[in-house]
């Protein structure tokens, strides 16, 4: 009887372990999906949705290295010749999660991306494609831990990039190097292992 009471006292005084895999101090994997609405700034701004799937290697509760496949479209409000941009890219980033209390994990990330961008005018036969690179992508967000394996939350991401995408009114031999920046606001869902 005394040994049972002693064991019960020891177990009740032991600190509980992490309630979420995102808080565990070990290497883990996260699979995620995200959807956002944003602006792409090229010659003019183009607005539209983008989607992504990601795999993240988690080193403890704070540091993560992520890899993502992303696609998005944007329509221009240009009155003379409206156009659509379609972007496909591979991205990677380093992410740091902050421990602010039970169930809430703000985070910041910094990364790069590489891909292609396609331009199509709604009323012209002109089409163009080019490679694109985001030299810097800064992300800010909050993960709300739901249960042991799930995190969901909003994010904001801005990027500074470059492309040589030609527009319909560019001269044939012109240097078409231009900035290609973007700002996205969306939500992501992660499953942790």
What is each stretch, according to the model?
Residues 1-8:
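Sec-dependent signal peptide recognition
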Residues 20-24, 39-44, 78-84, 99-101, ...:
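Outer-membrane beta-barrel domain signature
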Residues 164-173:
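Short helix/strand-capping connector loops at secondary-structure junctions
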Residues 14-16, 47, 100, 104, ...:
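Selective for proline/serine-rich intrinsically disordered segments
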Residues 148, 163-164:
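Amphipathic C-terminal alpha-helical segment
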Residues 155-158:
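Internal, hydrophobic beta-strand segments that form the core of beta-sheet-rich folds
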Residues 9-75, 160, 180-193:
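Short glycine/proline- and aromatic-enriched beta-strand/turn motifs that initiate or cap beta-hairpins
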Residues 54-153, 186, 190-193:
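Gram-negative (and chloroplast) outer-membrane scaffold detector with strong preference
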């Amino acid at each position: 009887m005394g040994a049972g009471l002693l064991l019960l006292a020891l177990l009740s005084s032991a600190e509980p372990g992490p309630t979420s895999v995102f808080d565990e101090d070990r290497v883990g994997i996260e699979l995620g999906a995200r959807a956002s609405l944003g602006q792409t700034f090229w010659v003019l701004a183009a607005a539209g949705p983008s989607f992504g799937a990601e795999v993240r290697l988690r080193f403890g509760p704070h540091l993560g290295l992520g890899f993502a496949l992303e696609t998005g479209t944007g329509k221009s409000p240009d009155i003379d010749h409206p156009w659509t941009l379609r972007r496909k890219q591979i991205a990677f980033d380093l992410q740091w999660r902050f421990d602010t209390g039970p169930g809430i994990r703000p985070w910041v990330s910094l990364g790069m991306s590489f891909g292609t961008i396609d331009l199509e005018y709604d009323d012209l036969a002109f089409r163009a494609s080019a490679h694109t690179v985001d030299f810097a992508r800064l992300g800010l967000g909050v993960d709300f831990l739901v249960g042991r394996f799930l995190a969901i939350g909003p994010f904001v991401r801005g990027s500074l990039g470059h492309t040589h995408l030609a527009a319909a009114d560019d001269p044939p031999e012109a240097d078409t190097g231009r900035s290609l920046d973007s700002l996205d606001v969306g939500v992501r869902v992660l499953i942790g292992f």
